[in-house]
UniProtKB/Swiss-Prot annotation:
GO biological process: protein maturation
Protein name: Protein yae1
Lineage: Eukaryota, Fungi, Dikarya, Ascomycota, Pezizomycotina
Pfam families: Yae1_N
Main function: The complex LTO1:YAE1 may function as a target specific adapter that probably recruits apo-RPLI1 to the cytosolic iron-sulfur protein assembly (CIA) complex machinery. May be required for biogenesis of the large ribosomal subunit and initiation of translation.
Family the UniProt entry places it in: Belongs to the YAE1 family.
Broad class of where this protein is predominantly found: cytoplasm
Annotated Low complexity bias: 105-119
Keywords: Cytoplasm, Nucleus
Gene Ontology cellular component list: cytoplasm; nucleus
Region (Disordered): 1-35, 100-121
Oligomeric form and interacting partners: May form a complex with LTO1.
Length: 211
């Protein structure tokens, strides 16, 4: 035994077997799962955002013309009923101004008695109440949720385009009220009045130029 062996100790005897290397670890760094979740979430949101943008625009392009047309027709129906109500209110004000207070009746030029103002007022009020009830019913039934209620997702996803199915549903609701209010007749009267106003305005303009 040498002096160095006395100081540092003897070396261990050589071994005949080979040491096996440690198996590779599969443990991820602690921040990788968090980063993966963040990237997945960000990608999911970006995908939804891009999909919504394209589908919403496509749905708007397909559905807006139909909805706008139905909305204008519903507005025409409600506008007619509102105009009739205002007409009854204005006629009532005119009657009150023309007839003195407390006067129950009047005599026409041919000597026959005309209906009393009280009876005329009662009839007018009854008719106005009838039209008001019709208007309130129209407001309720022409609400967009009421017009399109009853359509299930199964019906829409059955192969037919959603805007076609919704348009047919809206056509039924709007068409019923157009027939009830007689919209075509009102439109004809409005066209005649507008034409009359145009002719009157043109005639007035000619007279002004000649004078």
């Amino acid at each position: 035994m040498s002096t160095l062996d006395d100081i540092f100790g003897s070396s261990p005897p050589p071994t005949t077997h080979h040491a096996h290397p440690n198996p590779p670890t599969t443990t991820e760094p602690s921040d990788l799962p968090s980063l993966r979740r963040q990237h997945v979430t960000a990608g999911y949101r970006d995908g939804i955002s891009a999909s919504k943008t394209s589908h919403v625009q496509a749905g708007f392009d397909a559905g807006f013309p139909i909805g706008a047309q139905l909305g204008m027709r519903a507005g025409t129906i409600l506008g007619i009923l509102e105009g009739v109500l205002r007409g009854y209110d204005e006629s009532q004000k005119a009657v009150v101004k023309k007839l003195p207070a407390g006067r129950k009746g009047a005599t026409s030029t041919n000597g026959t008695a005309t209906p009393t103002s009280t009876m005329t007022d009662e009839e007018r009020q009854a008719k106005r109440a009838e039209i008001l009830a019709l208007y309130q019913q129209a407001v309720k039934e022409l609400d967009v949720r009421k017009v399109f209620e009853g359509i299930s997702e199964k019906e829409i996803s059955g192969g037919e385009k959603a805007e076609v199915r919704l348009g047919r549903q809206g056509e039924g609701a709007i068409g019923k009220w157009e027939e009830k209010v007689r919209v075509p007749r009102w439109e004809e009267n409005m066209d005649a009045l507008e034409m009359k106003d145009t002719v009157t305005a043109e005639g007035t303009g000619v007279e002004v130029e000649e004078s």
